[in-house]
From Swiss-Prot:
Name of the protein in its database record: Urease accessory protein UreF
Compartments in which it is found: Cytoplasm
Keyword terms, alphabetized: Chaperone, Cytoplasm, Nickel insertion
Keyword Transmembrane: no
Purpose of the protein: Required for maturation of urease via the functional incorporation of the urease nickel metallocenter.
Organism expressing this protein natively: Albidiferax ferrireducens (strain ATCC BAA-621 / DSM 15236 / T118) (Rhodoferax ferrireducens)
Keyword Chaperone: yes
């Protein structure tokens, strides 16, 4: 991967990208509120499980399949995968998150010459989800597929660690230890996601869905619903 591709990929994965990823806790704040997560160890275990059981089998698997579809212009496949993401968000909050981040990344793409006008128009007509928007942006970097999945997963990890720091709450050193644990597991998660066919892709995480739904009506919260 050349320097330009690497820097573009780092840009896409950066929490500074104005798409709002830092404003969601994906059920973690509700887990804290219900005393399921109260310590550094519990936060680390929670996020490692979420990486393994949720992100790997859903978003990372979709990303692995949608990047080649963008690169070869397979509009039917792109539409199918985008619809799958929408259908498998099990709470209003989780669906609103992927739609808002997808729209925000679409607007970012409109202002950068990283995708063609035809690709952007196709995405805009799909009620874009974040994984499909990221796949389009990442495919334009010409970075290898595996590296794009690594960047996506690490960007997710950074946002979720910040959510843990604010909601548990934890110190910065504790957050860095959790991030280190997540970073150690991300390569294996990505390699697994790359092997998943359509019938093995899933987003069945009932407790995460329940907590996300509870967070929608939680009395006091830091993160967006």
């Amino acid at each position: 991967m050349n320097a330009t591709s690497l820097l573009q990929l780092m840009w896409l994965a950066s929490p500074a990208l104005p798409i709002g990823g830092f404003s969601y806790s994906e059920g973690l704040e509700a887990a804290v509120d219900t005393a399921r997560v109260a310590t550094e160890e519990e936060a680390s275990e929670w996020l490692l499980d979420q990486l393994d059981l949720s992100l790997t089998r859903s978003d990372l698997a979709v990303l692995a399949q949608s990047m080649p579809a963008w690169q070869c212009g397979d509009t039917a496949r792109i539409s199918q995968l985008n619809a799958w993401v929408l259908q498998t968000r099990e709470s209003n909050e989780l669906r609103a998150q992927t739609e808002q981040m997808g729209r925000s990344l679409l607007e970012w793409l409109r202002n950068h010459t990283t995708a063609t006008a035809e690709q952007i128009e196709l995405l805009a007509n799909l009620q874009p989800t974040y994984p499909l928007a990221f796949a389009l942006a990442a495919s334009a970097t010409q970075a290898p597929l595996r590296d794009c999945l690594l960047a996506y997963a690490f960007g997710w990890a950074e946002n979720m660690v910040q959510a843990a720091i604010k909601s548990v709450p934890l110190g910065q050193s504790a957050g860095q230890r959790i991030l280190q644990a997540l970073a150690a597991q991300i390569p294996c998660a990505v390699d697994h996601a790359l092997t998943l066919p359509d019938d093995a892709r899933q987003a069945f995480s009932p407790m995460l869905a329940i907590l996300s739904a509870r967070h929608e009506v939680q009395y006091s919260r830091l993160f967006r619903s």
